[in-house]
Amino acid sequence: MSNISLESENEAVKRALESSYCPEPIREARQKQDEILCERLRQGPYKIADIGCGNGYHAVLFAPHCLLYHGFEISPEMAEDAHALWKKERIDNAQIFICDAAEAVVEEEFYDLVFCLYFTPGNIRDKSDDLSLYNDAYLDRNPRFIQTISRFYRALKIGGSAFFTMYKNVPETEAAQVDFYVHTGQRVVTPLGSRFVATAEGFWSARWTQDSIASNLGACGIGAEDIAFHDLNDIAWLVEVEKHSH
């Protein structure tokens, strides 16, 4: 179990999201992610689920193509920010559920699209202060990730798609992560070369290989033939999953 409070981790995430500082590779990947999705959503409107929706920005970005938007967010403070943003932008088809997405109650085959963006897939894990828990075997078959994504994969309609923004496990990614977290007032506690970066404030962010992605998604019932990797840049993929059957 973790002694770091959920509030501490939420505050670290909020600080990173609101920071004016962002390393160029991360900024570039986020921008390319949004460009690709805006283009893909032109055929809407769609019913969208967004795992770890943060400040609700995507409900605004995708509003022209959105029939309804359900954001799932564990931080009440981030949810408040989302409500404020939606009020300001006059978004009336969005709803936020304050919960752990792994425990969310969602209707089967309801959504056209499921999102888990801005590297949120790499934040999903069993919380522990013992960093040795997160060994290669754990990262290749992360139980909490599998529980969360399986739940939302069941909520995806046949013919629907899920999109995940994921860090590549390369040194350039690790350098960008460390740079970002240090510049947002956090203290990195993992040695260089780990497959994840953790901070004393409770933030945790994993990097992925195509094999580790296929292994984790395979445990969710998703075949390798249904997974596509879209390069965002040298440090990130937008991973697309198409649901062809139950």
Report each predicted region and the residues it spans:
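Conserved class I S-adenosyl-L-methionine
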Residues: 1-43
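Class I SAM-dependent methyltransferase SAM/SAH-binding core
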Residues: 57, 62-103
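A short beta-strand submotif of the Rossmann-like class I SAM-dependent methyltransferase core
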Residues: 116-118
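A short glycine-rich, Lys/Arg-flanked "PGG" loop and its adjoining helix->strand segment in the class I
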Residues: 133-158
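SAM-dependent methyltransferase
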Residues: 159-218, 224-226
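Core SAM-dependent methyltransferase catalytic element
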Residues: 221-222, 228-246
